[in-house]
Each structure stands twice: as structure tokens, then as C-alpha cells.
Amino acid sequence: MCIRDRPGTVTDFEIPKKYGLRQTIADTLGIGGIMRGLRTIPVLLDVCRDMEELCPDAHLLNYVNPMAMNCWALSRATPIRTIGLCHSVQGTAEQLARDIGVPVADINYLCAGINHMAFYLRFERRTADGVEDLYPLIRRVVAEGRVPDWNRTRYDLFTRFGYFVTESSEHLSEYVPWYIKRDRPDLIARYNIPLDEYISRCESQIAAWDVIRQLLEDEATALAVERTHEYGSTIIHSLETGQPRVVYGNVANDHLIDNLPQGACVEVPCLVDRNGIQPTRIGALPPQLAALMMTNVNVQSLTVEAALTGRREHIYQAAMLDPHTAAELDPEQIYALVDDLIAAHGDWLPAFSDGDAAIAHRAAEHNGQANG
């Protein structure tokens, strides 16, 4: 689900670009993630209100980004049982398995954090002699210069924080303040960062759609039905049959991770069976990982607050605290950018689209504080 579809996505890229703020995906954090969250949360709440009336005991399996913002808002505003599902944990495990030359079926791992910024706390395999830690093999990939060209950002973060992050390099590069700089094209080249990547994907998908549709409709070229590593169908199967499975899900932090805020959306292993979806307690994360996550959690928290209360000032504050936005723009630029985006999205942000009145109120408030 993408609220306002391609026009909304293009707006989230093109207006920030006028301020010199470049993005890669813009669907999870950053100014693009904030705007996408503000457009999406009200629609998901409408879905949940329908569920409250029609199927109050059902589970909502959410695949929609910005995952953490969406699930956090739903956990606060509706009793519908929600789990957010992503493929970054199991997908990255498969990628690392290829990098180190170990079959993924032989690997066991424990991963925890927030969506798109969870880390493998353990990455290992059982051997005849016990358990082998596979992190030395990952470090060897770096030492031997075998880092894939498309994955340089994540491997760089790994060398500095000591654990490997789940989400892709193009995503990660816009969650932190270090890799995308408007006056540092050398960084873009060094880390092979695909700016405007989401727009490129949209254009490719649109261009290819007619061909894909013809292939799908032709029995000779129709896709074979095979299970992927996505969790949705297996969760439904376990809930209905009782067959136990462990999946990685995004749920409210109810004493699951000690050094992240209670109530925040966290990504942890969850046992699924006929008893429901049961998250696993992790305890405390390594302090450097929790500190890095908090730079993202702060933005998520204020965006959710804005979506649920309609208070425009929380949008400004979320943008000011966003690591990438704050590294590129000053406060006045950030305020102006937020105003421009809200105006451009118009009726898609009805709680905030009072336009000139809101801007005038903000200016008066700002002037009053300055004069005081």
C-alpha cells in the first residue's frame, strides 16, 4: 500500500532536492519517511476501525512502510493485534551466507532492534565441536576486499559498530548522517550510493508492467507458485494449525528490549502457534547499537505523535531530529521544507493542510519567542 502512489513519492524526493537534500528510498525515515508516515497512518487506522467492527479478534499483518511508525501508531490507537513483517532479517542472513560461503540452512542467528536497523547479536552455526561464531568470517570479507559493490555502506557500519545491520545499504545510507552529503560526491562514489533509487524502481516497474502482465496471463510463462521467505502465509498457518514457528516481527516494546523506550516498535523473534504471536524478550542491546537506534526512534516517536494528535509542530521537530536532514539543513530550511511538503501533499494530509494559516501561526510563534 502506497498512499498517493507515485505522485506522492516523487513529491517526497523532488521538493527536498530543491533544498539540496538527497535521498535513496525515502520510505522509512528521513523527510520522505516522515511524510509517508503521515499519509499512511490515518489509512491504516481506518482499516483497523473496520476490523474492530467486523473481525475484532483477527490479526493485522502489516507490510507497509514506514514500518516502525505505522505499527507504533496502531499499537497506541487501536486494540487490533498487529505485527509488522519485513524480509530484511532473513534476506540479509541469506546475503551474508553467500558472502562467507556457508549454506544459510546451517546458520543460526539472533537478531533484534528496530525495523531496518536491527542487528545480528549472534551469527553462528553448529559443528561437531560445538558452536562456531561466524562473525570472524564476515570480518574476513572486509579484510580480503570482498565486500560487494552494492553493500559498502553496511559493511562500513559493521567495521565501526561491531555488528551487522539488517537493512540494505541504500536504505541505511539515509538513516544516518555520514554517507550522503551534497558537497561530498566522493562519498556517493566511495559507497556506491544509488540516489533517487526508489524513483528509478517505480519507473522501471511502470515501464515493465505490460510485459509482466502478458507473461503472467500466458499459461506457458505464468509463474510457478512457490513459497518465499516472506512470513505472512506461515504465520496464518501456525495460528490456525498450532504448528510452532519463529518469525521476526515488529511489535510494541513491552519489556522486550531494556534500553529502547517502552511502547516503541521493536523487531524481535516471535513464536507463533495457536496461542498467538508471542514476542521474545531480548534484554539490553549493546549500548552503541541502542544509541544508534535512538536517533531513529526519536523521529518515529514524534511522527507518530503528529499523526495521532494533528500537532504540526511535531512534524518540524521530527524533521529537525532526523539524522540525515539535520546534517544537511539548518532549522529555518527544515521548517520551510516541511511547509512546502505539506502544501504540496494538500488533501492527502488533511490534518495539517491548513496552509497559510498554519505557516502564519508558526511565524508569529517564532517571532514571539525571538522577541521574548
Where do the model's predicted regions map?
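Internal, well-ordered domain-core segments that constitute the primary functional module
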Residues: 47-118, 124
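Conserved aromatic-histidine-acidic binding/catalytic patches
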Residues: 32-39, 58-62, 84, 220-223, ...
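Soluble or luminal CAZymes and related metallo-dependent hydrolases
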Residues: 39-43, 88, 227, 295
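Sparse, context-dependent recognition of short Cys/His-centered cofactor- or disulfide-binding micro-motifs
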Residues: 6, 29, 59, 67, ...
